Amino acid sequence: YLIRKLTQNNYKVTVVTRNIHQKSYKIKTQGNAGYIEIVEANIFDEIKIRSLFKKADICINLIGILYEKKRSSFKNIHTLFPSLLAKLSKQNKLKHLIHLSALGVSEATESEYARSKLDGEKEILKNFPLSTILRPSVVYSVDDNFTTNFMTLLNRLPVFPLYYNGQTKFMPIHSSDLVDIIFNIISKNIYSQIIECVGTETL
C-alpha cells in the first residue's frame, strides 16, 4: 500500500529488504515502473545503511519484531537501529524521518517489548527532533488473515502480554488508513509529532 501510494504521487522509493530474491517480484508489482529501487541490506550492516542515506530525502522506518531471535533482539531492532537512523538523518540533512512505534508503549512499562519501543522513540527525538513518530494499533489488510495470523502468533510466543489486568482491547487500523496518515505527514510537512493511529472499532 505504501509503495503504491508514494509512486502514484511521483515519489521515487528505495525499498530495503533482507532478501531481494524472495521479495523483489512482489515489491515491483506494487508501484509504477521506474519509481522503485530495491536494495538488499542487513540492518546490522552500518556501512550499507549509511550509503543509502546519501541519496535520500525522507526515511520511513517500518521495521519491528514481536519476538526476539538471535541478533534480532528488542533492543537492537527497536532502540539501537532507530537511534542510528535518527543520527544518519541529521548527518545527511534529511527532510523527514517517520518512525512506526506501537500504541500504548508509554503505559506498558512492564513489557520489555514496550520499553524497547519507548527507548527507540526517545533516541529518535533526541537525535533528530523533526521526526514524526506513529503509534499504530494492530495493523491489518484485506489480503491477510488477521485472525489466523494472530492465533499463530499466540501459539509461537512463550508469553503474550495482556495489559491492564487482562482487559486489553484492540482498535485495529487498516493498512491503507495508516498509509494515508504517512502520506499526509509527508505532503503536509508535519514534523515533531507523536501520533496515535487506531481504527474505528474496538475488539
Locate each region found by the language model:
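Residues in the short beta-alpha loop(s) of Rossmann-like NAD(P)-binding domains
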Residues: 19-21, 201
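Flexible, glycine-rich beta-alpha linker
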Residues: 111, 132-153, 168-169
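Residue-level signal for the nucleotide or nucleotide-sugar donor/cofactor binding architecture
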Residues: 44, 77, 170-176, 203
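NAD(P)H-binding glycine-rich loop region in Rossmannoid oxidoreductase-like domains
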Residues: 21, 25, 30-84, 88-91, ...
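Conserved sequence/active-site signature of Rossmann-fold short-chain dehydrogenase/reductase
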Residues: 44, 105, 139-141, 178
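A conserved pocket-lining segment of Rossmann-fold NAD(P)-dependent short-chain dehydrogenase/reductase
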Residues: 152-173, 177, 181-198
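N-terminal Rossmann NAD(P)H-binding glycine-rich loop of SDR-like oxidoreductase domains
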Residues: 1-12
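Conserved Rossmann-fold NAD(P)-dependent oxidoreductase catalytic core, especially the SDR/UDP-sugar
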Residues: 12-14, 65-66, 76-127, 131-137
